[in-house]
């Protein structure tokens, strides 16, 4: 810092001296310091204009005086010009301007342009540019530093953690990254940090698990910035940590890693991902430069990725304007021999035009090179050694040459600049060697002495070598020291010789070939072919480029001559595109350019297309359309090959009807040519479909011919119908359906071929011959053509015609499956003769399960049909059609061939539906269409909803009457439905008998035709094959009988609740999967138990916010039903009904539920009063564990939703604070949850915050993830204590006295305890004012001394300087109080003390701030503050984890014996646990507690705790708790079964449970916790080691012993 001060101080002096001094030659010496000073002050011209700089200095002085009043005089004195006083210079060199303290600023700290902090931010930006030339494009207007204590603290903690882990210093070093954001996002990012999910880039990792930041400050988005663009950039301070390099996912080498899901996940033990190819990006316009230069930061927490990486901290925000006046270079061909390609090591888009040595009088200075981004040539050829001998002052040079020549903005284009009759061009001079810094020394000398190197050139030219500072415009300032020189060439004559196109045309006129008039009219073919050729660039090395052009030129000609395809139209020329620097929105992939250029240079014939070839293509496509109407259609069919199918359907029909009309026949006939043409079309189609050769070409054109059948005009179809009503082909109208893939109609069409009948063809031929004969002039050629087209040599030829069919059906899934009939896919169906009554189906060929969708089944399977000469006519299938609503007469019908050809043919099938047309139900359809068709041979699919009326069956099949089909599957269906209805009816009867409310939500299963099966699926069959309900009931009945016999043998009478009379009801309950167990058993959970018994304190509460008042117990069994039976080992007469019991039941709002269960009511009525009262008392204490919660969120977030769902599942209820305050009871507790990141901005917006703080039953928690709630690792907010903030009226000397202040501080000292600290926070300006008054006023000095005394006791704190301490503001402001409340989040209360009359008190209380006077605070402290100490009053103890050791448990017992409440939402586990103690046990415990005290009591407790833990561990190992018959007590206990807890995770309060000898917990429930703590039984007690054998629980012992022998329930 001292060095920096020494370098800055002389600059300041020199600048002031230059302003005060004169000009002329004296002004040349301090030119360089003046320039530096102007840079430091934010800019200024080089001429030494003093006006703007003095104004800026005055403003800076006022700014410093405004923020630091104590330095006003010093700053003013420093601002005065001193002149040339040499003695003061050493003193000023040692002076250092103090930096502004960031800790005393708000979130945003604006920086003044020209200040040192502003320059530091600019240096960060400029040093992070990818291209140094970006300095001239970015203009930064405003800058603000970001001060976020929370994020900075986390950043420091992260560094400390990494350093503790042994990371290297290189990994811990700080650097900077950048992110361009919208204005509205700045506030959120600076307050909360950068959250994951902010980017859509996936190159380096998943954006949902990390954040992406830009490495370079000039590469902020994927698309280049446009001129005039504005934006905001957030500068982040980053710590890269351990970096992992990621291969480019688009490269071939990392294809496997791209396919792997783990490739996008963050890497453990790392903090950052970068791209392997990042070093290859050397230009802003490089391909994928933005993606490959990103940083990817992430951080792992305990078991998941953090939402905000801590090693990324916002540092500053700057606003910029992008100005891009530089035009895109027109890459002209070089005219100089010393021009070579761009030097890619420096910049990809900078042309290196000359390399050589720079000499000074023959002495080598450095190795340099000349480069330019706009110009590709030098105006003159330079020698390899450039010797410069002349030096000139810049001021003298500007007197001879206009100053505008020395402005860098003048040279923005690729051409020479003409100014004042001089042609000039500018280049950059870069030092090429990395050894030494000779050019830097040269730069310093030129800048310091304001000199210019001059080199005279030939042709009356000059070369000037200048410093970058000498090329700055007067309205700009150089911000970064540049290490390059500028080379300025000046000539009196132009040096750029650009040959225009006009000159070329004049000198070498092109010859215009003959017969090119038509070609020149459609020169658009060139653009069309070149656009289409872009698709072939990937294979440009394997094919000839001219052949690709020929292909697309031919296609263009086809479009132009009416082939039916959309004609290509060249886009109109837009001159505005020439002004744009970037024509495309994103960089294009130009990796193929090098190969193309190489081929273009060394194989130019590949890029040539001769005029002769072009004429051939033109004439070929022009003549191709001029076919004769009587000629064959082979040529037209070849054009429509497989790749042209999508254009062949409708366009051909138009061509065939329009083109022949344009041709003039040489014969003038009177017959109707159109009608003859239509007949020939029909004959040609018949020839191709019936009598054609089975050669490959004929097979190729079949799809085309099928479509030609549809292209016939309306009158021809009518003619065909009238001439052949029932025997010939019925042509169906083509429905206007959309064309599917490859031009095929998506409808299910089945075109049926006629087997051929000589009579049909002869009738057609005779009619045509007769029409020709009746013509006025007989046309022999036409007649011969017709005969040739027919191909008829004899009538017997038609009997030997082969049948061939090839159907292509496109079947897609129906979007309306419920509206369409079911379809069936059949394979390998062999049809028998007419006499065969069976339809055989190869079951092995169809193996798709019924649940498989149609899209999962292959659609290219073939149905092989073996034709038989005796097949019956398809007209016999009157009940069969493609769809029940489609009649058979609309389809293609064909008569059966009379030939004996047995050749097997193949028919392509794609999910052809087989349903009955007249069937009324799926069952009828199934019976009509198949025999022996089990579900194993049927595939249920869906049918296309666009099936038209013209679709029909194309296969002859045998229709078997429905009566002949056995209905095996219907038997299964009826059996299952019968059992289902029987089971449902029995369940309903049992539920009604027990008065259990239920909702029947199970609908009767519907068996469709394709879902019928002989038995259920394997999974269901294996689980339902046995009568599990009956077996369960029998086992339970047997077990209960064993228990009764065992108990009777011991002479213990049982209560009526479990007598044999109730065995039937118990068995009925067991049939539903319920268990009737004793309350002494530990096999069930008691999440919701006996709440109605303790509801007398809850009359005013909302029933929706409390636990359910059910007495049922949830069982963790398949049916999850609830039932409970309470038993007792005491012999109580049946008529003993105690008054306390009736009283408690009467108070319950849910007494109807209890009275509705007679067994439970009888048992409760027979309980002893003491036992029942103990139960009620314990249930009341259990009610204290009912925790309501409220999640405070300003915006919906996934985390809050997850927490809400989790807490709701645990049985907690959500409650708004206002609702809680209105209807709360003494037992209610509320937990307010807020995200830690929202504390600073939203904690004060919690409704009723002041009132909530007063209540001890309200606690606050700050969370970062769901695990914080599960593991109780959240931050406890507003724990205890508080702090006071006062205004100037409290320390006003006219009001306050020393005695009153001492009383107040004494009261504050008594109030503050280690558990609840109180503190008085005083603003800095008040202390400063007391210091100033203390020089003259003894009272102020005494007050200040008293405050200092208590400041040492940490009862008084002087706040650091911040915005409130300004002289123009009144402290404290509302924002200041809110910020202090968030910063001191552990202190519960904030009190604003004032002696003024506050009008808007509600504005303070709404933000959680208590407003009071000093007297009111001391006298009414309890009413103002309420709860504030966790020890002296009822408090919310910290949640005890599952792994607390014995020492921490025993230490809790040493605290005060006040009642404590557990505010845990899941109470250490997920379900509350209850213990029930009898009166005997309570008396024994009470006696032991009274008899022990002091150290003995603590020792006994510790011994008992230790023994209890030992016994529990041993019992857990044995899987089952054993009963100690010699030392037991009548303790009945209800436990609750959790979902998936660990046995080691037991709450600390579980040590205060009943004697370990009475713990009866099975293996299934051994991991559950008991939450009985001090509030259950009042004071801590020691566990008794002796028990009376007379009170042994025989019933429980017998039940457990019998369950060990045989337990069907397990």
From Swiss-Prot:
Compositional bias per record (Low complexity), positions renumbered to this chain: 52-61
InterPro entries: PIN_TASOR (IPR056242), TASOR (IPR046432), TASOR_ab_dom (IPR056243), TASOR_DUF3715 (IPR022188)
Record localization: Nucleus; Chromosome
Chain intervals with Basic and acidic residues compositional bias: 652-671, 697-710, 923-934
Chain positions with N-acetylalanine modification: 2
Family assignment from sequence similarity: Belongs to the TASOR family.
Official protein name in the record: Protein TASOR
Taxonomic placement: Eukaryota, Metazoa, Chordata, Craniata, Vertebrata
Gene field: Tasor
